[in-house]
Amino acid sequence: MKTLVVGVGGMTNGGKSTLSNSLHQKIPNSCIIAQDSYFKDDSVVPVDNNGLKQYDMIDALHMDMMMSDINSLRRDPESFLRQQCQKLEPTTMTVNTEVIVLIVEGFLIFNYRPLNEIFDRRYFLEIPYDVCKRRRSLRMYTPPDPPGYFDGHVWPMYLKNRQEMESMVSDIVFLDGLEPKEQLLAKVFKDVCEELERLRERLK
Protein backbone atom coordinates (compact mmCIF):
# COMPACT_ATOMS: atom_id res chain seq x y z
CA MET A 1 0.00 0.00 0.00
CA LYS A 2 1.34 3.43 -1.01
CA THR A 3 0.77 6.82 0.59
CA LEU A 4 0.19 10.07 -1.31
CA VAL A 5 1.20 12.94 0.97
CA VAL A 6 -0.55 16.29 0.46
CA GLY A 7 0.58 19.38 2.37
CA VAL A 8 -1.91 22.16 3.11
CA GLY A 9 -0.08 25.11 4.64
CA GLY A 10 -0.73 28.78 5.06
CA MET A 11 -0.95 31.72 7.38
CA THR A 12 -2.97 31.85 10.57
CA ASN A 13 -6.73 31.89 9.93
CA GLY A 14 -6.15 31.43 6.21
CA GLY A 15 -8.52 28.48 5.78
CA LYS A 16 -6.12 25.53 6.10
CA SER A 17 -8.30 23.41 8.35
CA THR A 18 -11.46 24.10 6.37
CA LEU A 19 -9.84 23.07 3.10
CA SER A 20 -8.15 20.04 4.64
CA ASN A 21 -11.33 18.75 6.26
CA SER A 22 -13.35 19.29 3.08
CA LEU A 23 -10.70 17.49 1.05
CA HIS A 24 -10.71 14.62 3.52
CA GLN A 25 -14.49 14.29 3.23
CA LYS A 26 -14.28 14.04 -0.57
CA ILE A 27 -11.35 11.62 -0.82
CA PRO A 28 -11.92 8.01 0.25
CA ASN A 29 -9.07 6.40 2.20
CA SER A 30 -7.75 9.73 3.43
CA CYS A 31 -6.57 10.97 6.79
CA ILE A 32 -5.49 14.29 8.32
CA ILE A 33 -2.51 14.93 10.56
CA ALA A 34 -2.65 18.50 11.93
CA GLN A 35 0.48 20.32 13.04
CA ASP A 36 -1.47 22.17 15.74
CA SER A 37 -1.78 18.84 17.58
CA TYR A 38 1.97 18.85 18.23
CA PHE A 39 2.47 22.08 20.18
CA LYS A 40 4.77 21.69 23.16
CA ASP A 41 3.46 22.28 26.66
CA ASP A 42 2.95 25.98 27.29
CA SER A 43 5.58 25.91 30.04
CA VAL A 44 8.38 25.11 27.56
CA VAL A 45 7.32 27.30 24.62
CA PRO A 46 10.13 29.83 23.91
CA VAL A 47 9.67 33.39 25.22
CA ASP A 48 10.97 36.59 23.59
CA ASN A 49 12.60 39.59 25.30
CA ASN A 50 9.16 41.05 26.05
CA GLY A 51 7.95 37.90 27.76
CA LEU A 52 5.66 36.89 24.89
CA LYS A 53 5.29 33.21 24.04
CA GLN A 54 6.79 32.38 20.64
CA TYR A 55 4.21 29.96 19.24
CA ASP A 56 4.97 30.84 15.61
CA MET A 57 8.26 28.98 15.36
CA ILE A 58 9.39 25.40 14.82
CA ASP A 59 10.87 25.20 18.34
CA ALA A 60 7.35 25.50 19.79
CA LEU A 61 6.36 22.20 18.16
CA HIS A 62 7.16 18.52 18.72
CA MET A 63 8.20 18.02 15.11
CA ASP A 64 10.01 14.79 15.98
CA MET A 65 6.74 13.30 17.26
CA MET A 66 4.88 14.55 14.21
CA MET A 67 7.41 12.95 11.87
CA SER A 68 7.26 9.71 13.86
CA ASP A 69 3.48 9.54 13.39
CA ILE A 70 3.74 10.35 9.69
CA ASN A 71 6.42 7.71 9.16
CA SER A 72 4.35 5.15 11.06
CA LEU A 73 1.41 5.82 8.77
CA ARG A 74 3.57 5.52 5.67
CA ARG A 75 5.06 2.22 6.87
CA ASP A 76 1.76 0.60 7.87
CA PRO A 77 -1.20 2.77 6.80
CA GLU A 78 -3.93 0.28 7.73
CA SER A 79 -2.79 -0.15 11.34
CA PHE A 80 -2.17 3.55 11.85
CA LEU A 81 -5.53 4.59 10.42
CA ARG A 82 -7.39 2.10 12.60
CA GLN A 83 -5.55 2.95 15.80
CA GLN A 84 -4.62 6.63 15.75
CA CYS A 85 -6.16 8.77 13.03
CA GLN A 86 -9.01 10.46 14.88
CA LYS A 87 -10.56 12.23 11.91
CA LEU A 88 -10.94 9.13 9.75
CA GLU A 89 -14.53 8.38 8.89
CA PRO A 90 -15.07 4.58 9.05
CA THR A 91 -17.11 4.61 5.84
CA THR A 92 -14.21 6.13 3.90
CA MET A 93 -11.75 3.35 4.69
CA THR A 94 -11.36 0.47 2.25
CA VAL A 95 -8.93 -2.07 3.66
CA ASN A 96 -7.79 -3.38 0.29
CA THR A 97 -7.10 -0.02 -1.31
CA GLU A 98 -3.71 0.44 -2.96
CA VAL A 99 -3.26 4.15 -2.07
CA ILE A 100 -3.85 6.12 1.13
CA VAL A 101 -4.00 9.92 0.95
CA LEU A 102 -2.38 11.62 3.93
CA ILE A 103 -3.30 15.30 4.30
CA VAL A 104 -0.76 17.15 6.46
CA GLU A 105 -2.10 20.51 7.60
CA GLY A 106 -0.29 23.30 9.41
CA PHE A 107 1.25 26.75 9.41
CA LEU A 108 4.91 25.65 9.40
CA ILE A 109 4.79 22.34 7.53
CA PHE A 110 6.96 23.68 4.70
CA ASN A 111 9.57 25.10 7.09
CA TYR A 112 10.76 21.70 8.32
CA ARG A 113 13.11 19.95 5.90
CA PRO A 114 12.45 16.30 6.89
CA LEU A 115 8.73 16.85 6.37
CA ASN A 116 9.23 18.84 3.18
CA GLU A 117 11.02 15.92 1.59
CA ILE A 118 7.98 13.61 1.65
CA PHE A 119 5.26 15.84 0.15
CA ASP A 120 3.85 14.85 -3.22
CA ARG A 121 1.76 18.04 -3.51
CA ARG A 122 2.07 21.34 -1.64
CA TYR A 123 -0.59 24.05 -1.25
CA PHE A 124 -0.32 27.34 0.62
CA LEU A 125 -3.33 29.51 1.47
CA GLU A 126 -2.75 33.25 1.72
CA ILE A 127 -5.02 36.15 2.68
CA PRO A 128 -4.38 39.92 3.01
CA TYR A 129 -3.06 41.43 6.24
CA ASP A 130 -6.32 43.17 7.15
CA VAL A 131 -8.43 40.04 6.65
CA CYS A 132 -5.98 37.93 8.62
CA LYS A 133 -5.94 40.42 11.50
CA ARG A 134 -9.73 40.64 11.60
CA ARG A 135 -10.20 36.86 11.56
CA ARG A 136 -7.57 36.44 14.27
CA SER A 137 -9.33 38.99 16.49
CA LEU A 138 -12.60 37.08 16.22
CA ARG A 139 -11.16 33.76 17.40
CA MET A 140 -10.68 32.69 21.00
CA TYR A 141 -7.19 31.43 21.83
CA THR A 142 -5.89 29.72 24.97
CA PRO A 143 -4.06 31.62 26.24
CA PRO A 144 -5.63 34.70 24.61
CA ASP A 145 -3.54 37.02 22.46
CA PRO A 146 -2.23 39.95 24.53
CA PRO A 147 -2.76 43.49 23.18
CA GLY A 148 -0.59 44.22 20.15
CA TYR A 149 0.38 40.57 19.71
CA PHE A 150 -0.73 40.33 16.07
CA ASP A 151 1.23 43.36 14.83
CA GLY A 152 4.14 42.84 17.20
CA HIS A 153 4.62 39.12 16.76
CA VAL A 154 2.16 37.13 14.62
CA TRP A 155 2.46 39.08 11.37
CA PRO A 156 6.25 39.69 11.55
CA MET A 157 6.76 35.95 12.23
CA TYR A 158 4.52 35.06 9.30
CA LEU A 159 6.65 37.22 6.98
CA LYS A 160 9.86 35.71 8.38
CA ASN A 161 8.58 32.13 8.12
CA ARG A 162 7.28 32.69 4.62
CA GLN A 163 10.62 34.06 3.43
CA GLU A 164 12.34 31.03 4.95
CA MET A 165 9.82 28.68 3.34
CA GLU A 166 10.28 30.19 -0.12
CA SER A 167 14.05 29.78 0.20
CA MET A 168 13.62 26.09 1.03
CA VAL A 169 11.07 24.90 -1.52
CA SER A 170 9.83 26.12 -4.89
CA ASP A 171 7.04 23.78 -6.01
CA ILE A 172 4.26 25.24 -3.86
CA VAL A 173 0.85 26.04 -5.31
CA PHE A 174 -0.28 29.34 -3.77
CA LEU A 175 -4.02 29.67 -3.24
CA ASP A 176 -6.12 32.80 -2.72
CA GLY A 177 -7.84 32.26 0.62
CA LEU A 178 -10.51 34.80 -0.34
CA GLU A 179 -11.80 32.60 -3.15
CA PRO A 180 -15.10 30.82 -2.40
CA LYS A 181 -14.45 27.65 -0.42
CA GLU A 182 -16.14 25.51 -3.06
CA GLN A 183 -13.82 26.81 -5.77
CA LEU A 184 -10.71 26.21 -3.70
CA LEU A 185 -11.84 22.71 -2.86
CA ALA A 186 -12.68 21.88 -6.48
CA LYS A 187 -9.28 23.11 -7.66
CA VAL A 188 -7.27 21.14 -5.11
CA PHE A 189 -9.47 18.05 -5.34
CA LYS A 190 -9.00 17.89 -9.11
CA ASP A 191 -5.25 18.29 -8.73
CA VAL A 192 -4.98 15.58 -6.06
CA CYS A 193 -7.15 13.19 -8.08
CA GLU A 194 -4.85 13.63 -11.07
CA GLU A 195 -1.83 12.90 -8.87
CA LEU A 196 -3.60 9.82 -7.53
CA GLU A 197 -4.18 8.54 -11.04
CA ARG A 198 -0.52 9.04 -11.91
CA LEU A 199 0.51 7.11 -8.81
CA ARG A 200 -1.92 4.28 -9.56
CA GLU A 201 -0.58 4.04 -13.11
CA ARG A 202 2.94 3.66 -11.75
CA LEU A 203 1.76 0.88 -9.44
CA LYS A 204 0.35 -1.22 -12.28
Go through the PLM ranges and name each one:
Residues K16:
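Conserved lysine of the Walker
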Residues Q25-I33:
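Post-Walker A helix-loop "phosphate-sensing" segment adjacent to the P-loop in P-loop NTPases
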Residues M11:
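P-loop (Walker A) phosphate-binding loop of NTP-binding proteins
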Residues N50-K53, R113-E164:
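A glycine- and Lys/Arg-enriched "phosphate-lid" helix/loop adjacent to the NTP-binding pocket
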Residues C31, K40-E89, V101:
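Conserved nucleotide-sensing/catalytic segment adjacent to the nucleotide-binding pocket
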Residues K2-T3, T97-V99, L138-Y141, P156-K204:
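NTP-dependent small-molecule kinase module
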Residues V6-G7:
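Short hydrophobic/aromatic beta-strand immediately N-terminal to the Walker A/P-loop
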Residues L19:
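Hydrophobic positions on the alpha1 helix immediately C-terminal to the Walker A/P-loop
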